[in-house]
Amino acid sequence: MEHLQGALRTYTWGSRTLLADLRGTASPAPNPEAELWFGAHPAAPSTIDGRGLDERIADDPRAALGERVVDTFGEQLPFLLKLLAAGAPLSLQAHPSKEQACAGFEREEDSGLDLHDPRRNYKDPNHKPELIVALTPFQALAGFRPFTRTAELLEVLDAPGLNRYTAMVDPADEEASLRALFTTLVSLPRKAAVALVEEVEHKARVLVESRPARLADWMHDVLAMYLELVEAYPGDIGALAALLLNYFNLQPGEALYLDAGQLHAYQHGLGVEIMANSDNVLRGGLTSKHVDVPELVRVLKFSALTSPRPQTQPNATGEEFLLPIEDFRLSRHRLSAEATLKVETDGPAIVLCTSGEAEGSAPGGATCALRPGEAVWIPASDPRPEFRARQGGQAELFYASV
């Protein structure tokens, strides 16, 4: 059991206050702080005493990961745990399946495109299912809304320039229709795209400001989000995705699980995110980074996503999120001096503190203290530690394992 130094990522959409306030560092921070990575991804591995976790694992993979994990996933940690702080909307994006990632990575490797080239879509051959758990109110767009519901919104919006495209949707073949509609919109020439975005912006602004009785609350929230996206990315056709995707306003402790091919864009808030150990992102707009619409469309799932909220299973101090994959497990725990967390997996684990102060102790005398934003690495070969809140207080921990 050793302290794990997270790798800070300073993307433009990050927040100057969310991570800083959680960690107790200078706030506002000098630059937007977007993510704090706890894992062994080679793009930004966490460190232990200045040495990358990926290197530590490579020294003795079976001791670090355990026989079961190595036999199933190879000699790499199969998950990446993050703190994610969105101060501005993230890009409109999706992630490939394992099969798609392997093929895409091999294709780009064979083409000679450098791994660090900004045009690169596939940074590794891994899929990237992900779970986000809100620590603050957290807004997100995720998965296509059933089009019967979207049709209600478009009827109230009544934007003629948009209606000419949405008329192509056939309720009898919603999936194929959504594919055609989305592909058409994100492929519009720049001039036509800007004109359409501005027309919808005008219509949306009138509705949001006047709030007529026919505008349901959920419609108001979607249109308000659209206006925010247009303000952040003027003329970006990706903003129109807000009209097609489910809108979620998560409260602390609530979560979303997104499998491969699910279109999404996180908007605002602080959360704990866990995913397969990948940095593959296919973008369709709302970003200054590389956008590859044909590749994004190729991996997208256009069926409606009706239930991205994962089920949970209560445990002694919180709950575990029940997920349909083997790459990672995540549970949330609220501790006191009496209510403790015992790490029992036969594989590796990372324990992250998000509030209060906690202390861990293991057979043999190893101890550690955790404050918000701090984590410990527990290799498979180490004695199994137990965590409790310090000094009679309370603490919240997230326990990631395989």
Regions found by a protein language model. Give the residues of each.
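A short beta-loop-beta micro-motif enriched in histidine and acidic residues
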Residues: 31-33, 76-77, 87, 126-128, ...
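Generic C-terminus detector
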Residues: 88, 357-402
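A short hydrophobic beta-strand segment most commonly corresponding to one strand
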Residues: 90, 131-137, 269-288, 328, ...
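Short acidic-glycine-tyrosine-enriched beta hairpin
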Residues: 247-258, 262-266, 272, 362-383
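Short beta-strand segments in beta-sandwich/barrel cores
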Residues: 255, 339-341, 356-361
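C-terminal, non-catalytic macromolecule-binding modules
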Residues: 269-320
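Conserved short histidine dyad/triad with adjacent acidic residue
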Residues: 314-316, 326-345, 372, 381
